[in-house]
């Protein structure tokens, strides 16, 4: 419709050279011109041809330049993925040529902040026109039509935009503004997507921490029966004296913290276990832990070895020691929690006289209790363990026992070893966490490994974190394959 209109000898400075694909090979410049001149005057059409043939044959694509940018965009909106030309199976593909990407709008568009609300578009144009031709100027306005104190200015070239930034950024403070004017390149779509993903990641991590709070057992109650059953199994086993070795250690830690703890605080873990059990309507050892006050009094007494005639009391004292070491919700400091790490290392020796099954059961139970301690005090617990585990676990590739090593992928690009450690630490004692880095680009490969010191923690992590959404992706968490398998994972 516009093909017969008068036009200058050259296209406008902001005109776009477009690439067009899915064109019949039999079409010449004449047919193409007839098609495109419906949208505006055409300056040039260049059909790509295969010069190896004689005569050269069309490759089914071309470049086209309109006199105006508007005509090119109208043609693209009407034809791209919309119209199928005769003899073709797919619609026309029309987009700016690669050479045009060097002059993309996002590379020439400026954000102007701290603009006086009394300014209009003409005032902004007058301020920035000395730096070059302005393609577009727009002030952001609210629903009431009032200026929001910021604007966008698009120049015809990037060099003009750079000159404006260099000369105008923080050069003056406009009327009614508290800070100097801000002039910078506007956020690109990629920048906006990155910010959005970062915000989503922060929200997801906050939700993860919130889900681990003592008062919210949603993410933990499904695991509670495992740990409570293990405690119950140990407490009711025939070899009750095997637990008595924990008593002196429990008493030592208990008396060391009496200034910050009381009987109610010592029962917090038991109450937590009982609450988790109640959420599942499952009877548990939590009731046994809270039903007797004698273990609590024993913990604050001297560390003398208990009599073999009081095996049941010794058992309860030992479980009480686990309570103490797992921590309380008030009056507890980082040094108190530090005892948990030492306790973990001494657990095996304290059970040296016990049977293998009892030792294994209590070891797994302790891992569960450690998780509940993280639930009760997520921020303090993480602070303590990050200072201890972080020294050796983050970045190392030390493996745990069979069934305790996890393979995690779909990690965010910006995640490092410490981030991975912090995310998986609430489920148990992490012996190593490693995000793999591409040696060529020094960027994350978006997968990594986490190893625990026991399989129960690994299963807890899988249950809670597999499918956990971060940004646009969902984590995939699975057990690392055995060394005997042919594949590493």
UniProtKB/Swiss-Prot annotation:
GO BP term, example: mRNA splice site recognition
Localization per Swiss-Prot or TrEMBL: Nucleus; Cytoplasm
Keyword entries, A-Z: Activator, Cytoplasm, mRNA processing, mRNA splicing, Nucleus, Phosphoprotein, Repeat, RNA-binding
PTM section of the record: Phosphorylated during oocyte maturation and dephosphorylated following egg activation. Dephosphorylation is calcium dependent and correlates with the increase in the activity of EDEN-dependent deadenylation.
A single MF term (Gene Ontology): mRNA 3'-UTR binding
Source taxon at top rank: Eukaryota
RRM domain ranges (all copies): 16-99, 108-188, 404-482
Entry keyword annotation includes Transcription regulation: no
SUPFAM superfamilies: RNA-binding domain, RBD (SSF54928)
Span of the signal peptide: none
GO-annotated cellular components: cytoplasm; nucleus; ribonucleoprotein complex
SMART domains: RRM
Location of the region described as Necessary for oligomerization and EDEN-dependent deadenylation in the Swiss-Prot/TrEMBL record: 183-210
Pfam family, one: RRM_1
Location, primary (coarse class): nucleus
InterPro entries reported for this sequence: CELF1/2_RRM1, CELF1/2_RRM2, CELF1/2_RRM3, Nucleotide-bd_a/b_plait_sf, RBD_domain_sf, RRM_dom
Family: Belongs to the CELF/BRUNOL family.
Subunit comment: Oligomer. Oligomerization is required for RNA-binding and EDEN-dependent deadenylation.
Role summary: RNA-binding protein implicated in the regulation of several post-transcriptional events. May be involved in pre-mRNA alternative splicing, mRNA translation activation and stability. Mediates the rapid and sequence-specific cytoplasmic deadenylation of EDEN-containing maternal mRNAs following fertilization. Binds to AU-rich sequences (AREs) of jun mRNA. Binds to the embryonic deadenylation element (EDEN) motif localized in the 3'-UTR of maternal mRNAs. Binds to RNA containing several repeats of the consensus sequence 5'-UGU-3'.
Domain topic, free-text comment: The 2 N-terminal RRMs and a part of the linker region (between RRM2 and RRM3) are necessary for binding to EDEN of mos mRNA.
PANTHER family the record matches: RNA BINDING PROTEIN (PTHR24012)
UniProt protein name: CUGBP Elav-like family member 1-A
Organism: Xenopus laevis (African clawed frog)
Gene symbol of the encoding locus: cugbp1-a
């Amino acid at each position: 419709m516009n093909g017969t209109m008068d036009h200058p000898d050259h296209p406008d400075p902001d005109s776009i050279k477009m690439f067009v694909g899915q064109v019949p090979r039999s079409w010449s410049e004449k047919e193409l011109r007839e098609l495109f001149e419906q949208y505006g005057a055409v300056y040039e059409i260049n059909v790509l041809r295969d010069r190896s043939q004689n005569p050269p044959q069309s490759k089914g694509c071309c470049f086209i330049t309109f006199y105006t940018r508007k005509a090119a965009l109208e043609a693209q909106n009407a034809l791209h993925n919309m119209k199928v030309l005769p003899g073709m199976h797919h619609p026309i593909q029309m987009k700016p040529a690669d050479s045009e990407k060097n002059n993309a709008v996002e590379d020439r568009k400026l954000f102007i902040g701290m603009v006086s609300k009394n300014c209009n578009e003409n005032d902004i144009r007058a301020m920035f026109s000395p730096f070059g031709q302005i393609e577009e100027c727009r002030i952001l306005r609210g629903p009431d039509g009032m200026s929001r104190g910021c604007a966008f200015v698009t120049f015809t070239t990037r060099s003009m935009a750079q000159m404006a930034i260099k000369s105008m950024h923080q050069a003056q403070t406009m009327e009614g503004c508290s800070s100097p004017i801000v002039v910078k390149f506007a956020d690109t779509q990629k920048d906006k997507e990155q910010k959005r993903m970062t915000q989503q990641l922060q929200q997801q991590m906050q939700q993860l921490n919130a889900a681990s709070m003592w008062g919210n057992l949603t993410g933990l109650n499904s695991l509670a029966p495992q740990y409570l059953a293990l405690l119950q199994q140990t407490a009711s086993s025939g070899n009750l004296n095997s637990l008595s070795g924990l008593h002196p250690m429990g008493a030592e830690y208990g008396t060391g913290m009496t200034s910050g703890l009381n009987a109610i605080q010592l029962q917090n873990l038991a109450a937590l276990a009982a609450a988790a059990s109640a959420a599942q309507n499952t009877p548990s050892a939590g009731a046994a832990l809270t039903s007797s006050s004698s273990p609590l009094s024993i913990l604050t007494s001297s560390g003398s070895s208990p009599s073999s005639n009081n095996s049941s009391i010794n058992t309860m004292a030992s479980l009480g020691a686990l309570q103490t070491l797992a921590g309380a919700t008030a009056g507890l400091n980082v040094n108190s929690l530090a005892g948990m790490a030492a306790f973990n290392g001494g657990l095996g020796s304290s059970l040296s006289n016990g049977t293998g099954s009892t030792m294994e059961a209590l070891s797994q139970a302790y891992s569960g209790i450690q998780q509940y301690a993280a639930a009760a005090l997520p921020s303090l617990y993480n602070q303590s363990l990050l200072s201890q585990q972080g020294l050796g676990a983050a970045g190392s590739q030390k493996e745990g026992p069979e069934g305790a090593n996890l393979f995690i992928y779909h990690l965010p690009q910006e995640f490092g070893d410490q981030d991975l450690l912090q995310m998986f630490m609430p489920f148990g004692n992490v012996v190593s966490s490693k995000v793999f880095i591409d040696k060529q680009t020094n960027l994350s490969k978006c997968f990594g490994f986490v190893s625990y010191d026991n399989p129960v923690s690994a299963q807890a992590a899988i249950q809670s974190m597999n499918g956990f959404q971060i940004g646009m992706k969902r984590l995939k968490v699975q057990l690392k394959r055995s060394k005997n398998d042919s594949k590493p994972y």
